[in-house]
Amino acid sequence: MKRIVLFSMFVVIIASAVRVHGGDCPRFRGPAGDGRFSETGLLKEWPDGGPKLAWSVKGLGKGFCSPTVAGGTVYVTGMDDQDQGYLFAFGLDGSPKWKTNYGPEMGKNGPAKPGTRGTATIDGDLIFIMSSFGRLVMVEAAKGEVLKSIDLLERFGAEQAKFGFAECVLVDGGKVICTPGGPDASLAALDKNTGETIWQTRGLSQPSGYCSARLIRRGSQRLVLTMLEKALVAIDPDTGKLLW
């Protein structure tokens, strides 16, 4: 059974940071996806007996994702016994806000451990989830309404990832960048509001590599970096052109 556990130090830091809009963690490994956080004054060692438990939540089902935090809300996914994926929303005190079903996830009959994979990406009033079956789901953050659900395998002619798609999609301005892994579509960018395809990586057809893309700068140049099945690649985020 999946459980969220947050310790009092973590909750206090996050709660105070949200008030100054500096402590949100809207995607996997922090705001920039690099594992860096702006909080200061953290304890250098635990007190005797460990940190005090602030709250915990049971009944989330199975999953391998990380929680994300934005605007005073914690979001996390889990899969129930019917192999259905759910997105849960909690306050910073653990109080439930809502949960919503967003479709099937890889269950016990799949080739890998059952459960959700992708960590939710939060962008303002929208949340984006990549399911283990390659479906990009857009959810409204306030009440959990599913706005769109796009089958990326069907759209880009991609094959199912053996162990389930596992990525936290990248939002860049008005684009959602993901890795369908189809012919001429190792990566693709979709309009974050309409779901229409903006670009795909022509000439690059490697399958997805269970990796979350990062946006970096090298001088004045912006690059999207990610791992595919057999290569580390750099993509122009504006055009989808393979740079190296």
For each predicted feature, which ranges?
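Bacterial N-terminal signal peptides
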Residues: 7-16
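Positively charged n-region of N-terminal signal peptides that target proteins for export
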Residues: 1-6
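Noncatalytic, solvent-exposed loop/strand surfaces
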Residues: 18-244
